[in-house]
A protein has these predicted regions:
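C-terminal motif of bacterial Sec signal peptides marking the signal peptidase cleavage site
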Residues: 15-18
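Short, well-ordered beta-strand elements
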Residues: 24-38, 55-60, 134-138, 236
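A conserved helix-loop-strand patch within extracytoplasmic ligand-binding domains
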Residues: 97-146
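Ligand-binding cleft/hinge of the Venus flytrap
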Residues: 45-53, 128-164, 268-269
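A bilobed periplasmic-binding-protein/Venus flytrap-type ligand-binding module shared by bacterial periplasmic
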Residues: 109-119, 215-229
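A ligand-binding cleft/hinge motif common to bilobed small-molecule-binding domains
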Residues: 80-94, 177-202
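An extracytoplasmic/periplasmic, membrane-proximal ligand-sensing/linker region
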Residues: 28, 38-41, 149-161, 165-182, ...
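Short helix-initiation/N-cap motifs at beta->coil->alpha
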Residues: 34-37, 58-72, 163-174
Length: 279
């Protein structure tokens, strides 16, 4: 009996210690969506910088909804790929225990994208070319904000098209194959993304503005992050990529077999920029 009481006491002490010490401030959990080029690139760069400062960084791969929910619960510290006001606006509104740290990119855009040889310029013209496009819009993951927006485009423009959802990688592969065959194709696309540097593409005009205007990419954190990690919060408030630096980063990352090493090289190449973020 005394042995059992002793074991129970030890367990209570351990539980109390865990409650009082809280989370390890040197371990940072950052959410990331695999296949989303800009998010992967920014996350890998941030990971390199934080690790050089002595932090241990754990990347948690999940969907945007799961990452935001995990941040709201305090299990994930950061997410660098929140698109506002349209793409993730309704998602962010569901979670009261997260906070914005800063804007990392100002010129983001969502839309329906076609190869430049396709001879239409606006979404409303899709109606007249159902045969050429096989009545399909090639989309990405079902949980993505752009997926919901494309569904609304089909309704607003009264298109008789099927929205095909699979993955970002599958969408890009189908786009590449169509371009090789000079076949007409329309996909859910966005900038920044390396595909605009590697392929000749154009956005279709969206006169109804269903897909919105320019978006900003925001960095969000769990609600108490700024209080617990003021130095890191200050750093993330300064992280910013202009169009040139983002294009360079995405170009370097695309096709890289070791994104961590590529991120290290990019950080070294842009040392002055990174120093400014850390001041």
């Amino acid at each position: 009996m005394r042995k059992i009481k002793s074991m129970v006491l030890c367990l209570m002490v351990l539980l109390l210690a865990s409650c009082t010490t809280g989370r390890n401030k040197n371990i940072i959990h950052i959410g990331m969506v695999d296949g989303w080029a800009e998010g992967v690139a920014m996350t890998e760069v941030a990971k390199v910088i934080m690790e050089e400062k002595g932090y241990h960084v754990v990347i948690q791969r999940a969907t945007p909804d799961m990452i935001l929910a995990s941040m709201n619960n305090g299990d994930t510290d950061l997410y660098m790929d929140v698109w506002l006001p349209l793409t993730h606006g309704s998602k962010v509104a569901k979670f009261p225990n997260i906070e914005e740290l800063g804007t990392s990119y100002n010129h983001a855009r969502n839309g329906l994208v076609v190869p430049d040889y396709v001879t239409i310029d606006g979404i409303e013209e899709l109606k007249r070319h159902e045969k050429e496009f096989d009545k399909r819009i090639i989309g990405i993951e079902k949980g993505a904000g752009i997926t919901r927006a494309v569904d609304q485009v089909i309704k607003d423009y009264e298109l008789g098209y099927k929205h095909v959802n699979s993955s970002t990688v599958a969408m890009i592969t189908e786009l590449q194959n169509a371009i090789k065959a000079k076949r007409w194709i329309v996909v859910a696309g966005w900038q920044p993304h390396w595909m605009f540097a590697k392929m000749k593409l154009k956005f279709l005009d969206d006169p109804k503005k269903t897909l919105g205007d320019a978006e900003q990419i925001k960095i969000f954190a769990r609600g108490d992050f700024r209080l617990e990690q003021p130095e890191l919060a200050r750093f993330f408030s300064k992280v910013y990529f202009d169009e040139s630096t983002m294009a360079d980063l995405l170009s370097q990352m695309q096709g890289s077999q070791n994104k961590a090493d590529t991120a290290k090289e990019w950080v070294k190449k842009h040392n002055d920029l990174v120093k400014g973020w850390l001041q």
